Amino acid sequence: IGSWKSKYNVFCLDERTDHHRKLFNNSTFTHLMIVVENLYKSFDGVNVLNDISTTFEKGKTNLIIGQSGSGKTVLLKSILGLFNIDKGNIYFGNQSIQNISNKERSILRQEMGMVFQGSALFDSMTVEENIMFPMRMLTKNSFEEMQSRANQVIKRVNLINANKKLPSEISGGMQKRVAIARAIVMNPKYLFCDEPNSGLDPKTSTIIDNLIHEITQEFQITTVINTHDMNSVMEIGEKIIF
């Protein structure tokens, strides 16, 4: 366990040290990461998150690992602002999401990319149209500008021959590539992945893991992956939280 910890930089969710506070108080670091401080969340009186503190660093593949029911999805959704927390703070850089206006929250959400467990693609849209969708909703770019940007990320995730196909016409692994491309098309600062290997065979899982890891390093994104897959941990985990 000791050598595994030293290799992968592992933190327990209930580990209480001064490490997180020192990083949080250092202005050199705070713009590079997500900081979770003393987080509590309960449902119907049952504590799911109990005094959680940790950090997710820029340019690293940060993995939250745990069994079903361990609270990892609640933590991820709390960071995304999908759950109202009971107590504590979540910071994106120096900005606490507990004390921001609706306008600031909207801007922050545009800096986030999300890869959902089931890919969540639009069945009636082509690969290219799925990837263009966030730009259509959130920008005033021309169709030509959106198409050009979509084709850039299509090329980056190796889908150049599938851009005019429907999701039903491509494999599960290719669908996951579409989801990743859609998540990064707006040049996000933060990338969140919920069980990105769900339903994939081991070989394809490794390919998807490596693609996410490469994109994280290439664009210096703060990437947070929610997983129970130990192969992902061994393959790409730079910081592991369990």
Task: Identify what each model region corresponds to.
Residues 143-161:
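Conserved ABC ATPase "signature" region
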Residues 185-189:
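A short, proline-enriched helix->beta-strand linker immediately N-terminal to the Walker B motif
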Residues 166-170, 174:
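Conserved ABC ATPase signature
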Residues 191-194:
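Catalytic Walker B motif of ABC-type/P-loop ATPase nucleotide-binding domains
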Residues 227-228:
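H-loop/switch region of ABC-family ATPase nucleotide-binding domains
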Residues 202-204:
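Helix N-cap at the start of a conserved alpha-helix in ABC-type nucleotide-binding domains
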Residues 80:
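Helix-to-loop junction immediately C-terminal to a conserved catalytic motif
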